[in-house]
Amino acid sequence: MAKQPIFKKLVLLDKETEDLYRMADDLSEEELHDQSYGWSIIQVYSHLNMAESGSIRYMTKKMQAGDKLGQFTSFGRFRYMLTKGLLQSSLRWKAPKVVSQPKGDFSLKEMREEWAKTREATKQYVEAYPEHLLNRAVYKHPFAGRLDLAGAIGSFIYHQRHHMHQIKRIRKKIGR
């Protein structure tokens, strides 16, 4: 099945989301919402959820173009690999202008529930995605440019890894 590598990425995405949540297991709600050092940990989770849900909404809309979608190119693959390397690093940079201030008023339980709904929508999107469009550039990443579905799901993984560094910094600053 041509989507098998994408399903494997979804399993990895789930595992790494759980890793992110484990980083909050020993924190109080007060610590999770502490904005003394920029975004709180809950805001980081909210940002990741908003990025994933917004991406799925965007791709759902773009997929309506069907065969008119452009091909995922070699240059696109190159830009994706560069972006992947940057996202896996601990380097910091300003978020793209399309990123809004994430909500920080969720409890950890509410955040998990919201993100679980988003993840379920992501899985349903992948399951319903037509195999004949797998090589099409259905997603526009703010840095990498146009990506295919596998690249989009991969970018969710690397985006989470990037913010894992941020959560580690926040934990260190609050003395954890």
Name what the model sees in each region:
Residues M1-E18:
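Extreme N-terminal tail/first-helix region
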